[in-house]
Amino acid sequence: KALIENEVNKTYNKLNNYFINRNITPKNEYTGIFEGKNLIVILMESTNEIFINEKEYPTLYKLYTEGFSFRNNYSPRNNCSTGNNEMTSMTSLFTINNTCTANTYKKNVYPEAIFNIFNNKGYTTSSYHDYAEYYYARRTIHPNMGSMAYRNVTELKIPWSSVYEEWPSDTELVEKATPYFINEEHFMAYLTTVTPHQPYTVSSEMGNKHLEEFSDYD
């Protein structure tokens, strides 16, 4: 209430009033339904609802249509969008538009991050990405988020080219990362993909790999 009393911006106070008057409870009908389960998080870099296609992407289609899907949810296209949205998914914090928040605050520790939530429950946590540290300091960020082990394209031994458009294979990411965690009794693994990354105006090895299969699409 003090926040409302001290705020002079009417728009901000409209939001403040909305949130303060919400009926918040620590439990609902979904509380505990996944207790004791393992978790694999896949952050898909540079994709959209094109994959909601049963013919071409049956697994993703099944996950989207038979699981929980949140339509009124948006990833902000701000400064360094991948790193910032990755940070949001790990901490539930909104990132700052005028800086690469993940890199700017890479030395912070985040006890509330998703890795630490699972660490506190006795899980083995790990994270993986099929690219190098050119853009985001994941080697620092992920451990500070609580990831017990972070492995990039080199440690996963995934072939790749330093040419900008030659992104590594996400298929190999899954194949190389999975053995590191799948045999743990309780695990939480976080994978960030890269293959569909821009640019989209030039050919690339991964981009052309299945091109003939989509010849009927515009």
Where are the regions that the model predicts?
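Solvent-exposed soluble domains appended to multi-pass membrane proteins
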Residues: 16-218
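Transmembrane and membrane-interface helices of multi-pass
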Residues: 1-2
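Fold-level signal for large, globular catalytic cores of enzyme and receptor domains
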Residues: 5-16
